Amino acid sequence: SIRFYEEGEVAVVPYSRNGDRTISIVLRKPERIVDEYTQAKIKKIKSSKNTCTVFMKMRRQEGLEIKDVVLRYRSALTYDIPVKYDIKKTEKHYLITAYLNFDEMNLRELYWDLRIIANKYGIENEIRARFTSNYWKNNFYLTNRQYSAGEGHMTFPYYTKGGCLAFLYRQDSEYDAYSTKIKEMAASAIYVLFKPILKRKKIWLVYEKFCSMAQDNGYYFFKYCMENLSEEEKKNIYYVIDKKAPDYEKIKEYDDHIIQFMSLKHVLYVLSAVLYVASDSRTHLYAWRCKTSLIRSKIDKRPIFFLQHGVTALKQVGPLFGRKGSSPMTYFATTSQFEQDIVVKYLDYSEGKAPITGFTRWDVLEDTSTKDDKLILLMPTWRSWLEEVSDEDFLKSEYYKNYSSLLQSERLDKILEEHDARMIFYIHPKFAGYLKNFKKTGERITLVPFGEEPLNEIMKKCHLLITDYSSVCWDVYY
């Protein structure tokens, strides 16, 4: 090998690409160079209730010494959990067996990558565990691999976009059972048999966050369709919601056009629909953070008209919702020329794909505040780095400490009393499970659980909004 280093930070390595008699170079941080031309090929995966055994094969190289096998936490602040492993050496290869016992690991939500730590040229390198065929991807589609990982939690393996092995750790879900896989296979079979008929229906599926809400742009779009379109025009427009959700009461009058979330009909229509219309991304149309799923992979390929759930102006959403982001849209509704310019310039959509439509939920927004009820709405937005963390980690966050301190402030309670005002603390839906951790001081502060009262009704009657960088400010301003 030939090595060049630039100020000790970048390694330049020439190599022959696939034996095609050409020379290429790659510039990477030194600790990632070995991973460019060395593969830890996954040969086999064995599973039991709480353990996963991974068998890997790696070509031996002069000067390369394996030091460790770890699970690496995927986060801005990464840390490693050592994994038990064995190594056998043949003439040309290392045979590495990694033993992962998830019950014994102190895991955090969400993503963990399997890495081999090796030393070469005095530099510690990390080598990813890679799949070399689609066999395991297909295996994950058909099987129900998951591992117990402590009380109320589980982890499962998945195939990353780069073809590597990773694990997702989260709370248990009612959709983790093998019955979900059976439902997926049944729906797939029905779809294949009746695809021409189902496609002719031109089905539209409308939904909101987690398919558990009916109070955002998706709901008002659906309501408009039900009340203003002809029977022929609306006959194949459906709203997907969990009928156990409180908001179901608002739309049950349209029950012929309501589909129960995660029912066989839902899974079948997810495959059959020609368009999704939603205030949230495609991931909200299916079981949240589901295991490797053939249905979930099909959802990503269906057209979607994104109604948005907040004006795009305060947050950089390009990496997520941009045309080349992780969750791109087919059509992207905007509320003004100003917002359309942002979506076109920074998210890379054409004007035709980002029409100025306004928000359907704004059709019902009006000021219903009264002098007799001086209501203040306190609604901060969520924090991506705190999504689905444990209660213990959430309680340590600055977010919790600051808002908890405010809600228990005697000075705030005194101010509210002096002005005969009251305050509602409405936590973001993604933090709904953490509301139980907050306490308040006085009777003039109310902690409203997600779904108990429609947010737009609270906004309509509030005198003042206090927020950070939540797009809810645009609704109140409107």
What is each of the regions a protein language model found here?
Residues 241-247, 428-432, 470-471:
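Short, polar loop motifs at secondary-structure junctions
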Residues 266, 412, 454-455:
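Acidic, amphipathic alpha-helical patches
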Residues 288, 306, 450-478:
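A donor-sugar binding/catalytic signature common to diverse glycosyltransferases
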Residues 1-203, 227:
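Basic, ligand-binding patches in group-transfer machinery
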Residues 214-229, 360-437:
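Conserved catalytic-core segment of nucleotide-activated headgroup transferases in glycan assembly
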